[in-house]
Amino acid sequence: MKKIPYCRITCDGNELRYIKEVLDCGWLTTAGKTQELERRFAEMVGARYALAVNSCTAALHLAAEAMGIGRGDRVFVPTMTFTATAEVLRYLGADPVLLDVEYGTNLLTPAILEAAAMRYPEVKAVMMVHYGGQAAQMDTEDGHEGLLEVCHRHGLGVIEDAAHTFPARRNGRTVGSLGDVTCFSFYANKTITTGEGGMLVTNDEAIARRVKVMRLHGINRDIWDRFTAVKPSWEYDVVAPGFKYNMPDLNAAVGLAQLERAEEFRQGRERCARRYLANLTGLPGLDLPVLQVRPEDHAWHIFPIVLRPEASLTRNRCIELLAERGIGTSVHYKPLHRMSYYQQTYELGAERFPNAERTWQGCLSLPLFPTLTDDEVDYVCAAVGDCLKAAVCGSVG
């Protein structure tokens, strides 16, 4: 029996070389490698500023703080996302207003956001999640206005949660080059990793200045500057009560090696996704991801499928059957409105989120990583097909 994990990390490039350079230098925390990673990342996504932090959660928190979101404010958040997207608002005393998403893409659409903005005119901003590696429709397409136009008309600030979506494009525009601020993840299972880490990018100088200070205790001097400049290291000011969100150079060293291969890794994921699509299309009772971008513009962070009710196979049972064949899976996501904290705090009912509910009842994510072989993809697809056929015959459920 094959053993195919849900995720397999690739770190066989310049990672050890760059880590050794940091160790030989003797300066392990934030310094030259972090600055180089920031510069190269900004160039790649087409942003003026990039600021490395220790997680995408930290980036989201800093973004919301820098945009002035605070106690009593309300912010739109899609319910189909990881809890970090909403929890950072609670850190600041703000409230998430959860929204349903489009079935098949799990993205906010201009129509969904327009209706929500009309219903909740007091909302200050939106957390725009680019789900699964596919960018949401930010710009006008085919004469239909995009999410940014809706935001501008209603005075909504835009924080893009692009934890899934690097590198990615839509209509020639790179994710990270459009909104007020965009946050990326370098967690272990992402396209590129630093182990733990994230990046915040923006074209707004004021936001960049604020984030740079707040990511390290609200101190107005970088730690590298404090210990390398002529001015004494202890001569600095604390301008606000900040956070401990900086990225060490050891992590940045890994990130630099990974960044060199970002497109290679993305292409490997795309190859697997195309094979999944070819093999699984047409299977009864199965919905595949709906593509709104070219496959080559998709980051392919995950490959989610949805078992429809007529499949006669529950998601949990399918996961069990695949595990029996050595296949790892995951679920993206249990919607936030089903989490006890959000249910109890905001009295949310499932009827408000029909598309997310439809997805949640049958969704699972198949293995997807750049070193996944064609034979392994075929093995997974055959196993999924066997599960569906057995369910139709009544031998599983």
What are these regions (language model features)?
Residues 42, 89, 149-151, 280-281, ...:
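A generic structural signal for well-ordered alpha-helical segments
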Residues 61-119, 125-127:
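Conserved PLP-anchoring active-site segment centered on the Schiff-base-forming lysine
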Residues 104-194, 199-207, 314, 369:
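Active-site phosphate-binding strand-loop segment of PLP-dependent enzymes
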Residues 1-28, 236-239, 367:
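N-terminal "arm"/small-domain region of PLP-dependent enzymes with the aminotransferase-like
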Residues 34-39, 47-50, 57, 111, ...:
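PLP-dependent aminotransferase class I/II
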